[in-house]
Amino acid sequence: MFSTGTLLLAALISPALAGPWAIICAGKSSNEIRTCDGHGCGQYTAQRNQKLHQGVDVLCSDGSTVYAPFTGKIMGQEKPYKNKNAINNGVRISGGGFCIKMFYIKPIKYKGSIKKGEKLGTLLPLQKVYPGIQSHIHIENCDLSDPTVYL
């Protein structure tokens, strides 16, 4: 049997090692941010034409399973573009003090509860729209602050 001190220590260490958000893409051991390629860079505030990138791009292969980063509610559909229909899909998730938009996924649902690490959907085919890009999930805080620290 474990002592109370041992159990308390384990409870404190586990979340610290896990980080606040779950691994977002199947087959990855961490939430790695996209580096620069011919289509731009994936870090927060990277230059994009005449604007700054307002989220982060987490590497993920086209067609991979995408997981919820935290427990919360899927609030509805989000579309990043007016066109580019092959990848123009995503969701808004809110819970535990977080509110994010996740783009380039085909979600399993647009409303309802979701748990941290539960299947959220599938990454859409970025290569069809942006050949040669490092395929990724775009994650953006609803208040446009930097989400990098939660990855």
UniProtKB/Swiss-Prot annotation:
One of its GO terms (biological process) is chemotaxis. Disulfide bonds join C25-C60, C36-C41, C99-C142. It is found in: Secreted. Keywords: Chemotaxis, Disulfide bond, Metal-binding, Secreted, Signal, Zinc. One of its GO terms (molecular function) is metal ion binding. One of its GO terms (cellular component) is extracellular region. Transmembrane segments: none annotated. Pfam families: Peptidase_M23. Zn(2+) binds at H53, D57, H138. The keyword Nuclease does not apply. It comes from the Eukaryota. Residues 1-18 form the signal peptide. Has a neutrophil chemotactic activity. Also a positive regulator of chondrocyte proliferation. Belongs to the LECT2/MIM-1 family. This is Leukocyte cell-derived chemotaxin-2. It comes from Bos taurus.
